[in-house]
Amino acid sequence: MSDYKLKNVCDFDLAQTLECGQCFHFVKLDEEDYVLAAKGHVLHVSQEDDTVTFYDTEEDEYVNVWKDYFDMDRDYSAIKKKLLEKDDKLKDAIESMWGVRILNQDFFETLISFIISQNKQIPHIKKIVSDISAKFGTYKGTYGGVDMYLSLIHI
């Protein structure tokens, strides 16, 4: 299986998107290198500047799964511009988190993550999600030394 490279990506920062607290079923392998489970797949993904590499991912998997998951068809530049026209108080937030995209996650995983997130911090939530997946999920392989299981929706 080959790698799929997405070049000239705008308004996307992989680290900001994954680590902002909207998803928890991922492991950071390196500075810009992650493995995550979502939509019935395990993805090893990294970003260097404006190029995102989806390892062991064919183009059809990117188009059918990850393009929607990472909301890559949406024009975030236009959204940010419109927000700033209406309220310049958002400028600092937009500038500091310029690369966050809204992930299109499975409803059940989002719901369970929200329920267990009450009064907890991100590292603890990630551990709980990982433990639940390891106990009840289907093993998908080892990536970067980390055992990965299917997303909670597939339990």
Q: Where do the PLM segments sit?
A:
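HhH-family (HhH-GPD) DNA N-glycosylase catalytic core used in base-excision repair
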Residues: 1-153
